[in-house]
């Protein structure tokens, strides 16, 4: 990671590292370590960051919601720390553009892959913890996860838009939902798919993604935005 990129990611995170190698390792995918044998990669940091994130979110929810049961708190926490939520945090911070990975991984769409970006968030959290301590990383997590925490508390995080769309429409009885692949573009190793969701022969949402599944989920998400107003 060159000096410009290092300064840029520090500014994005709002963290200035005493040990720069920590953030460098946090943003190094295992494929890069396989290609360059001396390079450290982020899997161990990811392991630590997962526990740090769980602890900070758990303590926050425990102190904030004294009237909620263990089951309710567990459900809220699971929404905040799930892969989808971590991916949203990664996109907000543009982490994907800073992750070091092998050329092969990048050519197969690794830079946009949800799991790689979500894992990088956990590794970054570990890097901040090791460099700055628990108090600092707790503030860091609450700052960057604030929107996600509020969404989870208000039950606004949806993990499966297709299922939610189907459940919403079941209120009106038998309704036909179809997903139609409209087109795809790009080379085989980085192909983007475009899908319509058709409800009773009417296009209600258009989605795109780097897999057919992702495109269908995004189409369902758009349809939900249009339809939920009718059920409020």
Swiss-Prot record:
Residues 160-229 form the DRBM domain. Mg(2+) binds at residues 46, 119, 122. One of its GO terms (cellular component) is cytoplasm. SUPFAM superfamilies: dsRNA-binding domain-like (SSF54768), RNase III domain-like (SSF69065). It is an enzyme of class 3 (hydrolase). Its EC number is 3.1.26.3. Residues 6-133 form the RNase III domain. Its main location: cytoplasm. It catalyses: Endonucleolytic cleavage to 5'-phosphomonoester. It comes from the Bacteria. GO terms for molecular function: double-stranded RNA binding; metal ion binding; ribonuclease III activity; rRNA binding. Pfam families: dsrm (PF00035), Ribonucleas_3_3 (PF14622). GO terms for biological process: mRNA processing; regulation of gene expression; rRNA processing; tRNA processing. The keyword Chaperone does not apply. Its cofactor is Mg(2+). It is found in: Cytoplasm. Homodimer. NCBIfam families: RNaseIII (TIGR02191). Digests double-stranded RNA. Involved in the processing of primary rRNA transcript to yield the immediate precursors to the large and small rRNAs (23S and 16S). Processes some mRNAs, and tRNAs when they are encoded in the rRNA operon. Processes pre-crRNA and tracrRNA of type II CRISPR loci if present in the organism. HAMAP family: RNase_III. This is Ribonuclease 3.
């Amino acid at each position: 990671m060159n000096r410009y990129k290092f300064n840029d990611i520090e500014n994005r995170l709002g963290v200035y590292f005493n040990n720069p190698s920590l953030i460098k390792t946090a943003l190094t995918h295992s494929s890069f370590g396989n290609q360059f044998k001396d390079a450290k990669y982020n899997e161990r940091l990811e392991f630590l960051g997962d526990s740090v994130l769980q602890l900070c979110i758990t303590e926050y929810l425990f102190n904030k919601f004294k009237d909620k049961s263990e089951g309710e708190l567990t459900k809220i926490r699971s929404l905040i720390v799930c892969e989808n939520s971590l991916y949203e945090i990664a996109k907000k911070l543009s982490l994907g553009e800073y992750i070091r990975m092998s050329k092969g991984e990048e050519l197969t769409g690794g830079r946009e892959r949800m799991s790689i970006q979500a894992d990088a968030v956990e590794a970054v959290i570990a890097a901040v913890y090791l460099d700055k301590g628990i108090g600092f990383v707790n503030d860091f997590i609450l700052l960057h996860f604030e929107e996600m925490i509020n969404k989870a508390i208000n039950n606004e995080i949806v993990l499966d838009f297709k299922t939610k769309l189907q459940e919403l429409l079941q209120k009106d009885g038998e309704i036909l939902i179809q997903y139609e692949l409209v087109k795809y573009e790009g080379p085989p190793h980085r192909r983007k798919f475009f899908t319509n969701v058709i409800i009773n022969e009417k296009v209600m949402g258009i989605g795109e993604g780097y897999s057919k599944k992702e495109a269908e989920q995004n189409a369902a998400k758009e349809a939900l935005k249009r339809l939920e107003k009718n059920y409020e």
